[in-house]
Amino acid sequence: MNADFLGLLLLYLAILLCAAPLLGRHIRQAINGERTWLTAWGQPLERGLYRLAGVDPAAEMDWRRYAVAMLVFNVLGVLAVYALQRLQGWLPLNPAGLPGVAPDSALNTAISFVTNTNWQGYAGESTMSYLTQMLALTVQNFVSAATGIAVLIALVRGLARHSAATLGNFWADLVRATLYVLLPLSFILALALVSQGVVQNLDPYVEAQTVQAQQYETARLDAQGQPMTGPAGQPLTDTVVTRVQTLPMGPVASQEAIKLLGTNGGGFFNANSAHPYENPNAWSNLLEMLAILLIPAALCWTFGEMVGSRRQGVAILAAMTVLFAGFAASAAYFEQQPTPALRQAEAALLADGGNLEGKEARFGVAATALFATVTTAASCGAVNGMHDSFSALGGVTPLLQMQLGEVIYGGVGSGLYGMLAFAILAVFIAGLMIGRTPEYLGKKIEALDMQMVALVILATPALVLAGTAVAVLADAGRAGVLNPGAHGFSEILYAMSSAANNNGSAFAGLSANTPFYNVLLGLAMWFGRYTIIVAILALAGSLAAKPRLPASVGGMPTTGPLFVALLVGAVLLVGALTYVPALALGPVAEHLQP
């Protein structure tokens, strides 16, 4: 780990941790309906939306009604996004004349954006019209992030309230998170990105003549304009040689902002944040990294204020930061080593800069390694380099961060409610060790609570490992693997880990835009998101109904270094026990190969 990376990491964490308390306090005020600097313009719009939808924001919901409202809203979102994709060939704002998206790809994409995953088996500039990008995908970037915040707030209310039967109102939480948090921040960030050169227009694509002919592979399309596959399910491609380069345009900055702030991750372009029209320079790169973790870090402060003890939120944030710093250092160390090919050719002594394969020269190894750590610490999935080109052990960092459940900061809302499940597990383990009934924030942790916590922690590993096994055993699953051997297994494992944990990044050597992977990954995304959310809401309902117990002398404090260490240990231990065998078959085996 060199001085460049260390300086970048320290600068990043300093800005992030200074901004988190300010935003965290604002989120608490906004969600609770208190007056903020945005109330003057936001409140009339908020009230108008309630009247239009026939919603009483003061009507409290128990956890079941809260869950039903959330599920209905998200199912309707899937239907809307699917319909817009299928019909885009007949809809306006389609200057490239792109046809409707294939049914399996449209369903996968609809589930992906509604679940805050933003897994993309397609290239945005050659698949989605401007209308689809704006009305379908960008809208879901807002409301999927707001859904995560709403579910977290319901859990925090469950911890803060006592002897209560309700958790708040889903519709009010959704609207306030969107109006007072996501929209203003996205507007500010979009303007900042435009100032750095990010594209924002509705112009047709521009064709430019290149000096040198280019040769590339493109998907073979049928008469309906859909990708064709061979007998074994592998994608069919054609070689194209041309001197014409198409420069895609579009409303990029407005989607880029919420893609990052909402930890969504789906790029307007296929190259995502490695594309110069999405992420032009080092300043925009720093802004994008800060945007990804800003709200997840701030929500820790919101949690502390809502439960009446800021130190509770600081302890959770400290555990997240310790884990994040360790993974970031690991990624940087392995990526700053020469590649095995250079070392074998005895060129390592002359090589400078480490593993530059798959990295943009304008960012370099340090910024790419940090971005990869940031995007997989959050359930974001945006990338500024090719994760598939990371070294075998360098690629373990993004992979393992996802497999730990996206709780190292994590997604907007989802990261903190996942980490709170680990916090309850940690105090449960501590209670067993000292022979006391476990308590967290004055709430006794009982059988139902631990059942829900176990479901939250074990649901995604089950989906990841079962899905990987299915893909490896199926002919259609193996047909999508570009690289044989251990790395091919890693590509499948990464895809399932990304989908089930709602991250969305990929080892892009896997050809995943096939009916097999669109269905398999779609199921992983859906159940990986909503199994956990329903379990979290059930846990919140159980905790809200409990009386608050007075602090006892022998109770374990949940604000000090001991608790932080126990929480970090619980996260790492569960991850190690669950995924070490799979990691041994993939990246570890690849690293040990001659």
UniProtKB/Swiss-Prot annotation:
Location within or outside the cell: Cell inner membrane
Keywords assigned by UniProt, alphabetized: Cell inner membrane, Cell membrane, Ion transport, Membrane, Potassium, Potassium transport, Transmembrane, Transmembrane helix, Transport
Origin: domain of life: Bacteria
Predominant location: membrane
Annotated transmembrane regions: 3-23, 67-87, 136-156, 179-199, 287-307, 314-334, 415-435, 453-473, 519-539, 562-582
GO molecular function terms noted in the UniProt entry: P-type potassium transmembrane transporter activity; potassium ion binding
UniProt topology in membrane: Multi-pass membrane protein
GO cellular component: plasma membrane
Role played: Part of the high-affinity ATP-driven potassium transport (or Kdp) system, which catalyzes the hydrolysis of ATP coupled with the electrogenic transport of potassium into the cytoplasm. This subunit binds the periplasmic potassium ions and delivers the ions to the membrane domain of KdpB through an intramembrane tunnel.
Family the entry assigns: Belongs to the KdpA family.
PANTHER family in the cross-refs: POTASSIUM-TRANSPORTING ATPASE A CHAIN (PTHR30607), POTASSIUM-TRANSPORTING ATPASE POTASSIUM-BINDING SUBUNIT (PTHR30607:SF2)
Record's subunit section: The system is composed of three essential subunits: KdpA, KdpB and KdpC.
Name used for this protein in its record: Potassium-transporting ATPase potassium-binding subunit
